[in-house]
């Protein structure tokens, strides 16, 4: 439960403390995002220029909190209605917010998880700065509603691009491999968004996740994967931005042939045959399948 003084400041949009640019050193980096630090360090080392990073992430916050009100009113008005009882918003988000504002007698009490709040408190004030691009590592609080997130994430990028540039680079992290059944489908949904949102890129994190912890300890690798997207797409560096990403599948002689972007030279990390592929026929039932790499960038999958 938050104190009255904190609740009052939230109603004045005074959630973030005033700050200033700080040089990166052992003390300032200790309080900063490890993923963002690794991202910035790789960019600075590669480009040989200083990189300025602004961190205003809020743990557990849902995507809708970061979108401007006009956009939500026009494109997703239902999510604005009575948000603490709104089923569009994840149960945990609403429960945490309700607990935080329990001491408030203000029927219009605001909270950082409220739709639009973090945009108003943390994004709109940055409009005066020439932002070069965005890295985004949130989404857990929207994983309960894959279809809703697909729409909200598109609205998020449009909302922020209205502040800066039409195709502001937007690089995001795919959710990791914690043991939650719905996250597999959510990760695939995030992958598809790359083909919908222009000038975007996705860093895979499932191989660096933790089955029990939503905050896995492998930060540097994730930050550097984001940096590869920025170096390739924003700074036009000759660097492969990603590991293999699904592109097409064709069917021939009882087998599926899967092609990938960034798949040249594809091989397994232990040089053993590919494992864990499954295939389904018309009945929709998946069974273990044989998979092999052919021509270094295509995988043949069959149940023979």
Features from the language model and the residues they span:
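Cell-envelope and extracellular/periplasmic
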Residues: 1-304
């Amino acid at each position: 439960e938050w104190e009255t003084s904190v609740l009052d400041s939230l109603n004045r949009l005074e959630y973030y403390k005033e700050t200033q640019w700080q040089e990166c050193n052992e003390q300032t980096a200790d309080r900063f995002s490890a993923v963002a630090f690794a991202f910035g360090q790789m960019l600075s080392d590669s480009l040989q220029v200083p990189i300025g990073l602004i961190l205003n992430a809020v743990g557990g916050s849902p995507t809708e909190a970061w979108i401007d009100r006009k956009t939500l009113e026009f494109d997703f008005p239902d999510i604005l209605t009575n948000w603490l009882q709104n089923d569009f918003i994840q149960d945990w988000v609403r429960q945490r917010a309700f607990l935080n504002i329990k001491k408030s007698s203000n029927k219009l009490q605001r909270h950082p998880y409220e739709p639009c709040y973090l945009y108003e408190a943390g994004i709109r004030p940055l409009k005066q700065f020439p932002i070069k691009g965005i890295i985004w590592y949130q989404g857990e609080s929207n994983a309960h509603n894959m279809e809703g997130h697909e729409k909200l994430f598109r609205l998020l990028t449009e909302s922020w691009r209205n502040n800066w540039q039409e195709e502001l680079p937007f690089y995001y992290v795919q959710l990791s491999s914690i043991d939650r059944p719905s996250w597999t489908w959510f990760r695939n949904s995030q992958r598809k968004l790359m083909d919908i949102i222009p000038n975007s890129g996705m860093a895979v994190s499932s191989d660096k996740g933790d089955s029990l912890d939503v905050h896995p300890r492998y930060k540097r690798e994730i930050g550097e994967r984001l940096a590869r997207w920025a170096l390739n797409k924003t700074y036009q560096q000759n660097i492969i931005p990603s590991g293999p990403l699904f592109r097409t599948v064709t069917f021939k002689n009882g087998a599926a042939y899967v092609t990938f972007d960034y798949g040249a030279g594809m091989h397994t990390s232990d040089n053993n045959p590919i494992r864990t592929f499954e295939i389904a026929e018309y009945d929709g039932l998946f069974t273990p399948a044989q998979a092999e790499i052919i021509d270094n960038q295509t995988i043949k999958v069959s149940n023979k």
